[in-house]
UniProtKB/Swiss-Prot annotation:
Disulfide bonds: none annotated. Belongs to the FAM136 family. This is Protein FAM136A. Pfam families: DUF842 (PF05811). It comes from the Eukaryota.
Amino acid sequence: MAEEQQNRLQNAIDTMVKSLERDNIRKMQGKMFRCSAQCCEDNGASMQQVHHCIERCHTPLAQAQSLVTNELERFQNRLARCTMHCNDKAKDSFDSGSKEAQVKAQLEGCVIKCAEEHMNLIPSMTKKLKDALAQADK
């Protein structure tokens, strides 16, 4: 059961990332490449000027990718803390004399609850990221 929840959570994250890539990141990549091409077409610019121009073109995309990566890391860390809390509770129950089957059931229930709670965070995280990416694309 916990594995099923984990798969649902992973699929939801994958869907979110694909949506962000398709609707936001890809457009920013196109702008970055067109901007970089314009830099290269400036025959009067020095090699260093062209390089700086290309770097400026790449900055919004790099910031957007960093934003998504950081948000996903925060989400993953929160989920890991939640499951560690479940493990700690299970160990405490086992140490206090609870039967192994009871502890396993408690652990699985706790982990499923973590997954469900974090599944509920995905829509707001998606909106937050889409809003931030739209702002970065201006």
